[in-house]
């Protein structure tokens, strides 16, 4: 068994709400901090439950989440063995990396998002149907009617789901959703990017115009421009809340 590093004060009792998720987050943070390096074994359930101030049933549910994320592997006779987080792509692991590594890693994640932009725009302009055009206009209207930053943020996410659906590329949809899900519960830290409605609406209207005109080049450029601009606003919002 590989002995983990100092563990005595790493844990704080999780909030009572959604205890299993809080347990998973606490242990995941310890893993990412190197308290439990790859190949090491987590402490016995009784010890972990005592340190976290939770019962063993809740602890097992939290450990099950970690196993689902791929951060640990349960081996009979050996306990919960830590896997290498750098080899994992589960959105919850990526979200944990954003939480631990901060703005620099968020920038890297948003670079992936922006890189998908030209393909999204090009395919949407080439493949969208009249039904897609109607759905895009309806989604844009929801963004226009949003009267708070949080509502605008939610409407923007919904707009892009409609836009990506119009590409008729399921793999692209899965990739974009992976990036979106990687933000996990951190969306609130990015809401400030939607405080000013004008740049959001201006760019989304340009995307709509290019897609509905069936202009792949213009659509590719407008989607990429919007994702790059919104990424800058998101990083600023994230840093302002740090």
Curated annotation (Swiss-Prot):
* All residue ranges annotated as the HTH gntR-type domain in the record: 17-85
* Keyword DNA-binding recorded: yes
Which Gene3D superfamilies does UniProt cross-reference here? Answer: GntR ligand-binding domain-like, Winged helix-like DNA-binding domain superfamily/Winged helix DNA-binding domain
- Keyword line: DNA-binding, Transcription, Transcription regulation
Q: List the CDD domains hit by this protein, alphabetically.
A: WHTH_GntR
Q: What start-end ranges are recorded for coiled-coil regions in this protein?
A: none
Molecular functions (GO terms) = DNA binding; DNA-binding transcription factor activity
DNA-binding region located at which positions? 45-64
Matching PANTHER family:
GNTR FAMILY REGULATORY PROTEIN, TRANSCRIPTIONAL REGULATOR, GNTR FAMILY
Protein name, as recorded: Uncharacterized HTH-type transcriptional regulator Mb0505
Tell me the organism's taxonomic lineage: Bacteria, Bacillati, Actinomycetota, Actinomycetes, Mycobacteriales
């Amino acid at each position: 068994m590989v002995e983990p590093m100092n563990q005595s004060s790493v844990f704080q009792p999780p909030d009572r709400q959604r205890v299993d998720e809080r347990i998973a987050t606490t242990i995941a943070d310890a893993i990412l901090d190197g308290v439990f390096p790859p190949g090491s074994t987590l402490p016995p359930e009784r010890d972990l439950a005592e340190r976290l101030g939770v019962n063993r049933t809740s602890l097992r549910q939290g450990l099950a989440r970690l196993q689902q994320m791929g951060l640990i592997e349960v081996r009979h006779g050996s306990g919960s063995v830590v896997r290498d987080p750098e080899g994992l792509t589960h959105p919850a692991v990526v979200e944990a990396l954003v939480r631990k590594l901060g703005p620099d890693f968020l920038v890297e994640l948003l670079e992936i998002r922006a890189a998908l932009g030209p393909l999204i725009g090009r395919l949407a302009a080439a493949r969208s149907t009249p039904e897609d055009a109607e759905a895009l206009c309806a989604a844009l209207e929801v963004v226009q009617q949003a009267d708070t930053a949080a509502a605008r943020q939610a409407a923007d996410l919904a707009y892009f789901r409609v836009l990506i659906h119009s590409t008729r590329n399921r793999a692209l949809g899965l990739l974009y959703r992976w990036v979106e899900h990687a933000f996990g519960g951190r969306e609130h830290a990015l809401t400030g990017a939607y405080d000013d409605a004008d740049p959001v609406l201006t760019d989304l209207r340009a995307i709509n115009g290019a897609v509905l005109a069936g202009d792949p080049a213009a659509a590719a450029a407008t989607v990429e421009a919007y994702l790059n601009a919104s990424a800058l606003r998101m990083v600023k919002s994230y840093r302002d809340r740090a």
